[in-house]
């Protein structure tokens, strides 16, 4: 079992988030930490992550993301709670096109990251 698991930009690509996080949780030691970074399911995330990143900027191949698989923070928290993962912190992550930098933010409308502890 592991002390820390990083599920970074993965859950928005899996077919069954509940099963994926169940299996991830089973691999985590008690009191271990799981970090989950993903995309919120909002109109803004559709515009930025799919239209912007795939079609306009062409950072990713078209079809990389399926908006139906994006996960709202409240839904992620519930799934994690059902798998013995307690939310410790949740923040938005915002990318600045001008500075080419990411920053932690209270705005979780596109990208966000959660820190969960195995109980």
Predicted segment positions?
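Core SAM-dependent methyltransferase catalytic element
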Residues: 100-119
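Short, flexible, mixed-charge acidic loops at enzyme active sites
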Residues: 45-55
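Short Asp/Glu-rich motifs
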Residues: 46-47, 98-100
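Residue-level marker for beta-strand->alpha-helix junctions and adjacent short loops that shape enzyme
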Residues: 41, 95-97
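Conserved SAM-binding loop
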Residues: 1-46, 73-76, 114-118
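Acceptor-substrate binding/catalytic loop of class I
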Residues: 38, 55-75
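Short alpha-helix
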Residues: 67-90
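A conserved catalytic-core signature of glycosyltransferases
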Residues: 46-47, 66, 71, 111
């Amino acid at each position: 079992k592991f002390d820390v698991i990083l599920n970074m930009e993965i859950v928005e690509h899996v077919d069954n988030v509940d099963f994926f996080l169940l299996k991830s949780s089973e691999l985590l030691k008690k009191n271990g930490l799981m970090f989950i970074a993903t995309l919120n399911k909002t109109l803004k995330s559709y515009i930025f992550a799919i239209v912007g990143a795939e079609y306009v900027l062409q950072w990713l191949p078209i079809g990389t993301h399926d908006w139906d698989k994006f996960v709202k923070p409240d839904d992620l928290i519930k799934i994690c709670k059902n798998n013995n993962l307690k939310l410790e912190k949740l923040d938005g992550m915002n990318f600045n096109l001008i500075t080419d930098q990411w920053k932690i933010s209270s705005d979780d409308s596109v990208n966000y990251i959660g820190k969960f502890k195995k109980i």
